[in-house]
C-alpha cells in the first residue's frame, strides 16, 4: 500500500484565535499545494483539524469542557454547527486546488465511552475511502458521552487513529516551530522527563486540543 500519513491541522494554524471565526485560507491553500504534490507522488492522507477561533469561543462560553445541564445544549448545537462550517471551508479550499477531500462529521462516527474515544465505524471504512483516492477529513467535535456530551479533540483522534492504522507518519501542524518547554525552547527529543505535566500548564485549551 502507498505511504499513509495522518496529519493534524492545528486550530491555531488554520485560524487566528484572537479573532472569532477567522479563517487563514492562504495558509490552507499553501498547505494544499504541498499535499497535492505528495498525493500525486503516491502518499495517502487522513486529515484532522482543530476548532481554532470557530469552536473555542462558544465552547468556553457554554463551559463545554464538562457537560452538566440542559442549558448547555444550545452551546452543543452552535459548536457543532461552526465546526461543520469550518470543515466545509477547508474542504472547498483544498478541493479548489485538486484534492478530493471527503469530510466526515466526527460527532456521527465517534463517541466518548468510559472516558475514551470510541470509533463507531470500522477503520476499514476509512481505508476504503483512501483506496478510492479520496482524503478523509475529521475534526475535533462535540460528541455523545457517558455524561451527556463531551469534546473530542483533534489530538484525541490523532492518537486513536494512529494506534488503529499504524501510519508511516503522524504530523502535527501548528503556529509554533515545535513542542516547547516552559521557557519557550524547542524540545528536540521527547523523553519522560521532558513531557510537561498538566499541573504545570497555566493555559489549558478548553477543547483539549488546538
Question: Can you annotate each of these PLM segments?
Answer:
Residues 163-189:
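Acidic, metal-binding active-site segment of PIN/NYN-like and related structure-specific nucleases
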Residues 6-10, 48-49, 104-105, 137-139, ...:
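Short beta-strand segments
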Residues 57-68, 185-196:
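Short, flexible, mixed-charge acidic loops at enzyme active sites
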Residues 61-141:
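Ligand-binding beta-strand-loop-alpha-helix segment within the catalytic cores
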Residues 13-15, 52-56, 109-112, 143-145, ...:
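Short, active-site-adjacent cap segments at secondary-structure transitions
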Residues 27, 31, 77-91, 149-151, ...:
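Polyanion-binding loop/helix "lid" in catalytic or ligand-binding cores
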Residues 29, 117-128, 144, 150-161:
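Active-site glycine-rich loop that binds ribose-phosphate moieties when present
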Residues 1-46:
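N-terminal glycine-/serine-/threonine-rich phosphate-binding loop
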